[in-house]
């Protein structure tokens, strides 16, 4: 299985109320995939949000990366993704953080560790068949 790598630039950044909608399918042999909200275009940009469904360990990990160092991991409850199934994830910018909604259910509200106004791109990668990334 070949890994996906897709980046959507956000030259205006994100603001309160910005919604990012990611749609795709989890392949049958999927291990992990990620959605990163990056604070730049460069390879080692800080990540205001690292959203990382890990089907191989049945968990979803949230984190940030600042100056090349990962922060403290947070985990959601259960894994709302299934191999071979389509999914829709909404990441909504709120005053407190990034609210993730998977399907119709709020999953986890990840509190800001750096200003959301620093976000300049959305990166999706790993074991995923990406259908679309839309910004509202």
From Swiss-Prot:
Alphabetized Gene3D superfamilies for the sequence: 2.60.120.200
Alphabetized Pfam families for the sequence: Gal-bind_lectin
Location(s) in or outside the cell: Cytoplasm; Nucleus; Secreted
Residues binding a beta-D-galactoside: 70-76
A Gene Ontology biological process term: apoptotic process
Keyword NADP: no
GO cellular component: cornified envelope; cytoplasm; extracellular region; nucleus
Domain annotation Galectin: ranges: 6-136
UniProt key word Nuclease: no
SUPFAM superfamilies (UniProt xref): Concanavalin A-like lectins/glucanases
Keywords: Apoptosis, Cytoplasm, Lectin, Nucleus, Secreted
Gene Ontology MF terms in the entry: carbohydrate binding
Superkingdom assignment: Eukaryota
Function as written in the Swiss-Prot or TrEMBL entry: Could be involved in cell-cell and/or cell-matrix interactions necessary for normal growth control. Pro-apoptotic protein that functions intracellularly upstream of JNK activation and cytochrome c release.
Subunit composition and interactions: Monomer.
Entry protein name: Galectin-7
Upper classification of the organism: Eukaryota, Metazoa, Chordata, Craniata, Vertebrata
Gene name in the database record: Lgals7
């Amino acid at each position: 299985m070949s890994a996906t790598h897709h980046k959507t630039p956000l030259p205006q950044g994100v603001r309160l109320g910005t919604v990012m909608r990611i749609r795709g399918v989890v392949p049958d042999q999927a291990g992990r995939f990620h959605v990163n909200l990056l604070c730049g275009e460069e390879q080692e940009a800080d990540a205001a949000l690292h959203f990382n469904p890990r089907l191989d360990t049945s968990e979803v990990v949230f984190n940030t990366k600042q100056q090349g160092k990962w922060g403290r991991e947070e985990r959601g409850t259960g894994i709302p993704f299934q191999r071979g199934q389509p999914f829709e994830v909404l990441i909504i910018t709120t005053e407190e953080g990034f609210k993730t909604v998977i399907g119709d259910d709020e999953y986890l509200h990840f509190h800001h560790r750096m200003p959301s106004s620093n976000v300049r791109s959305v990166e999706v990668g790993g074991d995923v068949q990406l259908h679309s990334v839309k910004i509202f």
